[in-house]
Amino acid sequence: MNTLFMHCRPGFEGEVCAEISEHAARLGVSGYAKSKPQSASAEFVCSEEGGAERLMGELRFNQLIFPRQWARGGFVELPETDRISVLLSQLADFPVFGSLWLEVLDSNEGKELSTFCRKFEVPLRKALEKAGRLVDDASRPRLLLSFISGRRVFVGVAPANNSALWPMGIPRLKFPREAPSRSTLKLEEAWHQFIPREQWEQRLGDDMTGVDLGASPGGWTYQLVRRGMLVTAIDNGPMAESLMDTGLVQHLMADGFTWQPKQPVDWMVCDIVEKPARTTSLIETWLGEGLCREAVVNLKLPMKQRYAEVRRLLDRMEATFKARKIRVSIACKQLYHDREEVTCHLRRLDLKPR
């Protein structure tokens, strides 16, 4: 139970190790991080009993940037037959669980295991329920079984309210056929990640205004229009006719880094390919000068020192807003639909309600 196991995007194992090591050092939890390149996972092995539990207790999962999912526990080797009996014996010292997720890694090997997991879940679930190890109770911890192979599994536990929203941290979003580009799924995932579902009507309402900087062809604009917002799309490139036909979009041929609205808007979204430091300056201007209430902005990452650069820019934003004496909440996550980038959500907390 003294290893913290984390899923991530393939190629970002080093960023997960750097991030969790920094948090562990700050909290005084001794141990070491390890990973294999392109494995889509990383581990933090705690050297003291209770270290992994303390990390999960002190950290909020939604404040971590690069991990997609986490659980504390240990690896178990399974026989070719009667895997369920071995798992039941391993779970004797675990608490009673309120839910069960079987997970695989986001790799070719992981995809090959997904069929096995689907077939294995039904008999395993029945056996756990019969043994009194699994009950229908959302307040109880979640049992997370991350299969590395059919014979090797990480048996882990995580609080349901302090871990990923979806198995493996991968949302099941359907690409809308009428959307102009697949990038639309990035913004839809961001809504789920950063805004509690019960607040959507209030914060993503059809009486709101939005700006999409670098909008062409309209993947992110589509999400704003879908919520019924009036949108100003800023881009020198063309917009999809289907969006213009809605009557909700005004397309202005302008530079997303210099254009500003005459009146403050509710939302600013931006997915421009640019150096992250310049995009950070854009965020500081829009939130700092009250040009928008909330924003979702993607930061494109450098090739090296990616976690260090993201951390530096987030700290810079925080210092900038503090110096301006304004209250802004800042969240950042590498979403499943992100590539070499992270998504930031910012919200002014000191403006009067609409």
Curated annotation (Swiss-Prot):
It is found in: Cytoplasm. The keyword Cell cycle does not apply. Its EC number is 2.1.1.186. S-adenosyl-L-methionine binds at residues 183, 216-219, 235, 255, 271. One of its GO terms (cellular component) is cytoplasm. One of its GO terms (biological process) is methylation. It is an enzyme of class 2 (transferase). The active site is at 300 (proton acceptor). SUPFAM superfamilies: S-adenosyl-L-methionine-dependent methyltransferases. Gene3D superfamilies: 3.30.2300.20, 3.30.70.2810, Vaccinia Virus protein VP39. It comes from the Bacteria. Transmembrane segments: none annotated. InterPro entries: RlmM_FDX, RlmM_THUMP-like, RNA_MeTrfase_FtsJ_dom, rRNA_MeTrfase_M, SAM-dependent_MTases_sf. Keywords: Cytoplasm, Methyltransferase, rRNA processing, S-adenosyl-L-methionine, Transferase. Pfam families: FtsJ (PF01728), RlmM_FDX (PF18125), RLMM_N (PF21239). HAMAP family: 23SrRNA_methyltr_M. Monomer. Catalyzes the 2'-O-methylation at nucleotide C2498 in 23S rRNA. PANTHER family: RIBOSOMAL RNA LARGE SUBUNIT METHYLTRANSFERASE M (PTHR37524), RIBOSOMAL RNA METHYLTRANSFERASE FTSJ DOMAIN-CONTAINING PROTEIN (PTHR37524:SF2). NCBIfam families: PRK11760.1 (NF008734). Belongs to the class I-like SAM-binding methyltransferase superfamily. RNA methyltransferase RlmE family. RlmM subfamily. This is Ribosomal RNA large subunit methyltransferase M. It comes from Pseudomonas putida (strain GB-1). The lineage of its organism: Bacteria, Pseudomonadati, Pseudomonadota, Gammaproteobacteria, Pseudomonadales.
